[in-house]
């Protein structure tokens, strides 16, 4: 019995945008930047989806949580 073919396409590793552009700051008041890292359901996107490094993903998560606390970002949107 022949083996199934391996994946032809190799996924390219995403580069952390904050490491690439040194002048970009993560701030809880910058809602336009933070909305890129929040799904339409209000969940914080995973590191493998966003391509952030460990430290910057932590910083984004903390900034999103702080932004939710002061009501700049919603906790969740209407699902239905």
UniProtKB/Swiss-Prot annotation:
It holds the Pfam family Ribosomal_S18. Keywords: Ribonucleoprotein, Ribosomal protein, RNA-binding, rRNA-binding. The keyword Chloroplast does not apply. InterPro entries: Ribosomal_bS18, Ribosomal_bS18_CS, Ribosomal_bS18_sf. The keyword tRNA processing does not apply. GO terms for biological process: translation. GO terms for molecular function: small ribosomal subunit rRNA binding; structural constituent of ribosome. GO terms for cellular component: cytosolic small ribosomal subunit. PROSITE patterns: RIBOSOMAL_S18. Part of the 30S ribosomal subunit. Forms a tight heterodimer with protein bS6. Binds as a heterodimer with protein bS6 to the central domain of the 16S rRNA, where it helps stabilize the platform of the 30S subunit. Belongs to the bacterial ribosomal protein bS18 family. This is Small ribosomal subunit protein bS18A. The gene is rpsR1.
